[in-house]
Regions:
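N-terminal low-complexity, intrinsically disordered segments
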Residues: 1-28, 166, 170
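Charged, terminal alpha-helix-loop-beta segments
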Residues: 1-8, 32-34, 68, 194
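Aromatic/basic-lined ligand-recognition segments
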Residues: 11-18, 64-145
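Glycine-rich, often proline-containing surface loops adjacent to acidic residues and nearby aromatics
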Residues: 24-39, 63-72, 148-161
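Conserved aromatic-histidine-acidic binding/catalytic patches
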Residues: 34-45, 166, 170, 174
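Secondary-structure boundary elements
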Residues: 42-44, 48-63
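Residue-level signal for secondary-structure boundary sites
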Residues: 43, 77, 162-164
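Long, compositionally biased interface segments
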Residues: 148-194
Length: 194
């Protein structure tokens, strides 16, 4: 051992649940609660569902260390060229149609203790969930039809990290701040503003 502590096994139980439509669900384990949706319509509805879930679990939620909101948006070049959907600074050599393979852009912004990581991936392939997203528990939207095509995947993850005891008003305010920052960054990427 040489004085180095021996790692111990920690059992993690992961629970998943979806709504009746199959487009929204929760992933809950001993360290986190995540809400996933593949049919995002309204932040207020999503925030309300998340806060209701946390309120139900408030006896078990003692300490908050991270709050986050992540959105994935796929833009296909079918009805509109990608240049009509994505800002030009994210397109790379997209105009080189004959031999264009992919372009990858990543940015990290930090403001008011909110970290926002933005990834824009343009490629000619099948559209799929990133490997770190558990997309297998939810129904996939029509845009993920498994047909290879030229498309842009915009992946934006905005989060707060710290150590705070459970407080409903604090959670609501931080999630609103996170969403505002995420929306600002997304509007910097897309042509049609949200």
């Amino acid at each position: 051992n040489n004085g180095i502590p021996v790692p111990t096994e920690t059992k993690t139980k992961v629970l998943t649940a979806t709504d009746l439509s199959g487009y929204e669900g929760f992933i809950f384990n001993n360290r986190s609660l995540t809400i996933h949706t593949t049919s995002y319509v309204c932040f207020d509805k999503l925030l309300s569902a998340l806060l209701n879930a946390i309120e139900i679990l408030k006896e078990q939620v003692v300490l908050i260390e991270r709050l986050g909101f992540r959105t994935l948006n796929a833009f296909k070049e079918i009805d509109k060229k990608l240049s009509a959907q994505i800002q030009p600074q994210f397109l790379g050599m997209y105009g080189e149609q004959n031999n264009f393979q992919h372009n990858y852009n990543e940015s990290l912004c930090v403001s008011n203790n909110i970290n926002t990581l933005s990834r824009v991936i343009i490629q000619n392939s099948v559209i799929a969930f990133p490997p770190d997203v558990q997309g297998d528990i939810l129904k996939t939207p029509d845009v993920l039809d498994n047909l290879p095509c030229l498309h842009a995947m915009v992946d934006i993850d905005s989060s707060w990290s710290g150590r705070e005891k459970y407080d409903y008003a604090f959670l609501k305010q931080v999630f609103e701040n996170i969403h505002d920052d995420l929306k600002l960054k997304l509007n910097n990427v897309v042509v049609e503003k949200l």
